């Protein structure tokens, strides 16, 4: 039976152990007899967490979309084009896309995995909360570079906002280009940003934060701190 939206009490430490065991036994023969345990320990509390987070975001006016049925990624891997045929992910994540005012109230701008928004990762040894613009298409990446060239003060103001720096330090990238764009001098003060293939930020979460019933507030606090960068990235258009 699914946990109701009002009953998130923190993840059971056994949920962390389950994911560690899954990483060591990533096959259907191990998982299928334990599927009900996965649902009880991880899936159902995850849905309850996202439901409570949705309430926190709305109350605090943080324009990120949290939906218990849509925000959480599936545990099953798509192995069709991968040499790794392991059937299950060894982490579980949830994304919370950026919203803007529309004709019917706030609406999701880009609900794809490559849009601007927040993210929560549940994985033994890799618990974290963060956000940004993950691996955007070429047009948005070029728009980001134009913003750096045309209005560096606006970019700097977002990246150096004290609350953001206190929570996350700085933005980073999963991957970078080896070379700068040909029209950017090597001594440009934001040359490092020009090499970014995406723009992300995050902070690690301790296990006792993840097992706490205050986790929805912890995530909402993190997303609030990330607003200067998320708002800036929301203005980036191809």
Question: Can you annotate each of these PLM segments?
Answer:
Residues 2-21, 50, 54-57, 79, ...:
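Long, solvent-exposed, polar/charged low-complexity segments
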Residues 20-78:
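Active-site acidic/histidine clusters and adjacent loop/turn architecture
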Residues 128-181:
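A contiguous pocket-lining binding segment that forms or flanks enzyme active sites
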Residues 35-38, 42, 133, 144-148, ...:
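Short histidine-centered catalytic/ligand-binding loop motif
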Residues 26-33, 135-142, 213:
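Inter-helical turn/loop segments and adjacent helix faces that build the functional surface
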Residues 59-88, 92, 167-181:
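A short, surface-exposed loop/turn module that caps and links secondary-structure elements
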Residues 8-26, 99-108:
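Short, charged low-complexity linear motifs
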Residues 78-151:
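Aromatic- and glycine-enriched beta-alpha-beta binding-site module
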């Amino acid at each position: 039976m699914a946990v109701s939206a009002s009953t998130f009490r923190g993840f059971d430490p056994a949920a962390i152990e389950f994911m560690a065991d899954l990483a060591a036994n990533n096959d259907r023969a191990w998982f299928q007899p334990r599927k009900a345990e996965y649902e009880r320990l991880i899936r159902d509390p995850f849905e309850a967490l996202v439901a409570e987070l949705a309430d926190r975001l709305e109350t605090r006016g943080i324009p990120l979309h949290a939906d218990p049925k849509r925000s959480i990624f599936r545990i099953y891997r798509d192995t069709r084009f991968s040499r790794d045929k392991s059937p299950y992910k060894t982490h579980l994540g949830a994304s919370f896309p950026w919203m803007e005012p529309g004709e019917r109230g706030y609406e999701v701008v880009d609900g794809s995995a490559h849009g601007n928004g927040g993210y929560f990762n549940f994985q033994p040894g890799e618990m974290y909360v963060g956000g940004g613009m993950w691996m955007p298409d070429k047009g948005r990446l070029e728009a980001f570079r134009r913003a750096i060239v045309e209005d560096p003060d606006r970019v700097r103001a977002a990246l150096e906002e004290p609350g953001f720096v206190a929570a996350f330090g700085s933005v980073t990238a999963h991957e970078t280009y080896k070379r700068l764009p040909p029209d950017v001098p090597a001594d440009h003060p934001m040359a490092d940003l020009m090499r970014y293939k995406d723009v992300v930020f995050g902070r690690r979460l301790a296990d006792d934060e993840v097992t706490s019933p205050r986790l929805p507030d912890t995530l909402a606090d993190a997303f609030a701190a990330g607003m200067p960068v998320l708002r800036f990235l929301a203005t980036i258009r191809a």
